[in-house]
């Protein structure tokens, strides 16, 4: 039965008082078009993010009227929803027009912390950019996106957030018939590389400049008076992207669809589709079963990030200089930042994961040797790094309870000898303090694919308890949480290294 309230609609208490801040919406055409959401029959709240709701400035519970808004059955009070247009390179191939095919911007609000946040419904029905598709999302993929975005936030990775997950019995045809769902995503901005590519592909410099100036004014205000503001802004976008992908690598996270239309100009992890946290470490791990050539494999991600930044620079080159040759020179100078920023970020991150206070160039060999051990022995990425915190420098005894996790124990013991030597080379070695530091960067819990699948299977039967359990667990990924030990275990063999479909 629908939860729609009879008679006149009044906003949920507190929602009407939440100040709207319609900045992006005022850009109007050609950036986006007004689109109303398609009603979702019999909506049910699967999970509501009370913590994020508090940050946004309204209550910790979603009553029936708020549910209607988050299902797309009622508009946000005082705001007209819209869908944005963009283009992009998908698996390296240029696509001149894409766009929000099932996502609608439903509000821009000012939080109590004076931050502007955009709210977007994903799965809200068809838009002018749906390319003949139904504009819906399915429960399976929506659970994954909801849990992943909040898990990544708790891990300290820049990301879009999710406020709510709403399900419906409405059937949706994908590879099989599934049920519909809608997630409400939150971010400071959903502007993507592909929006600039769209206008570049049409030779429309004026709207591209307007969009760039909007992004700078709203999200990089310190650059507004800069004499070369567009170049300075692009430099910061490149650096944010490099640091973001370094964080992905350090967590064993594979995005799965690193198309330019899925890259945020704010350096946020955007669009959780066939993503995955690696179980057993493989340099060329591919999480998307549609990625036949491994374009977006784990090892390829840093270079893909650089390539995507190059496409952005190519698109906005008219904003850098009037002369194409000079614009290209500026772009190449900016692009060189990517490799150096990525290298510094990833080396600092690996050092932190090994408990090293200093970063030395010779540490690259130690890191590569450890990753080689994982690759050859099919070691679990997350669990192996967490176990390293147990190794002590005050003894040369075998690292019992750790070495057993490695297939080649002799090779591991040899590596540990080198590792202990490196740890002891730093002054004032304190094993307890080091273990504490390591446990703050090596998570115990990540959203493994098999855990998400268990929650999905239960939710499809109407049991949302596992979604709630995972949402709570993943809020504290670095804590021991002894009662949840089973969630840190490696997956059973039949659920290892699941590759996920793009179908969502």
From Swiss-Prot:
A matching Pfam family: SelO
Entry keyword annotation includes Metal-binding: yes
Active site (catalytic residues): 261 (proton acceptor)
Keyword Metal-binding: yes
Alphabetized GO MF terms: AMPylase activity; ATP binding; magnesium ion binding
Cofactor(s) the protein requires to work: Mg(2+); Mn(2+)
Positions contributing to ATP binding: 99, 101-102, 122, 134-135, 185, 192, 271
Binding site for Mg(2+): 262, 271
Superkingdom of this protein's organism: Bacteria
Role summary: Nucleotidyltransferase involved in the post-translational modification of proteins. It can catalyze the addition of adenosine monophosphate (AMP) or uridine monophosphate (UMP) to a protein, resulting in modifications known as AMPylation and UMPylation.
NCBIfam families for this protein: PRK00029.1
Entry protein name: Protein nucleotidyltransferase YdiU
Organism ancestry: Bacteria, Pseudomonadati, Pseudomonadota, Gammaproteobacteria, Methylococcales
This protein's encoding gene: ydiU
